[in-house]
């Protein structure tokens, strides 16, 4: 009996959370380390260890929250598996040779998309069984559905890959907690778009087209179920331009909904005022793994911060109409190589961060999102009133 306990304890130690590492730590992993992206949670890790032939270490990526059959939002499988395939290919591009998707028994990605059979592992899972629960529940109709999207990407030498996901999840939950009758936060999506993926190790990339197709399909499904107010909330700058396209597509396809997004959190009138009030770095000190993001993490997950490794990176190639700060300045939009401006992956002055700043900025970010939710409700209600009254061309359509 003692030996079996030792064996179980040893097995539990072989698993590590990929997104809690820094990018240099990922770069140092042996390239034959198995990396597993699970669809949902609740799998048997002892069984998984056996399925992988009991390797010395296994990296568990953040669980993908929904999209497969039985998850509560069932997307067309070609759209869903394109997203998954792009994520797995990000790991392969980094040189990893044992990359897997862990999925419920009964899914057959080969039947609808060319996902190699060697790329997936199946186990019994709750989402394989009836009755299935819709996500969000139909009882939540009439609320603004908050859709937080983070990312899994490098954040310099001192922060984990999960920074964007931790921050936006906390903001979305905070907003929903303050107005439970007016909004509902969806499970956070930990994977977005990084067009600079190849510059530093460990950065994932869902791909712009797959990202757009996935989220437009989500809106299609939720609208068909009677939801009509949506707010895409991004914790990652690389998602922004694609989210603009998504809300435009959604508005064109569904004329009686109100689907919105915004630039990064803590960047509207409330957030910007709080940044200006509490920051100690100059312009250029807030961009990525910076004073702002590091402060958030010191407040929310200090156990994942390695402040002894902080390197301030403020040598951005700046001109009057193109420079880096949290609220980007200038009229030019561009996408030069990330490593033109950063040696470590960071943009900004992480050494200025404190947990107290993180607390204050989180409060401001939540207040800002609560304000946005109220505006989304007002926009939808006033527009519906006009439509129902036959305003302009609406009078010819009714």
Describe each region flagged by the PLM.
Residues 1-231, 235-398:
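Extended, histidine- and acidic-residue-enriched regions that form the cofactor-binding/catalytic faces
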